UniProtKB/Swiss-Prot annotation:
Cellular compartments per GO CC: extracellular region; extracellular space
Primary localization: secreted
Signal peptide feature range: 1-20
GO process annotations (BP): egg-laying behavior; regulation of female receptivity; sexual reproduction
Keyword Iron-sulfur assigned: no
Protein name: Accessory gland-specific peptide 57Dc
KW Secreted (keyword) present: yes
Protein's job: Transferred from male to female during mating and may affect egglaying and behavior after mating.
Tissues expressing the protein: Lumen fluid of male accessory glands, becomes seminal fluid.
UniProt entry keywords in alphabetical sequence: Behavior, Phosphoprotein, Secreted, Signal
Cellular localisation: Secreted
PTM text: cAMP-dependent phosphorylation.
Organism in which the protein naturally occurs: Drosophila melanogaster
Domain of life of the source: Eukaryota
Amino acid sequence: MHGTHFLILLLLCGVLGSNGVTPDIKNVAKAERNMHNMLRCLKKNEPIVKSRILTLPPNCNQYVSAVVETWKPEGV
């Protein structure tokens, strides 16, 4: 299932990169920490494949949300 880790990261980076926003200088360390925590959680907990649908482990949702929150555009 290590290929799924790559696909999840690729999908997340594609979505985050498509909005044209990067964290400001003050939040870069926070963004790096959030991404590190998310990857560590995904490494420990395999994604769930059910009926060919890939879902994240429930205990990793908070880390994914933190990454998205760090990278969201201003004013959203």
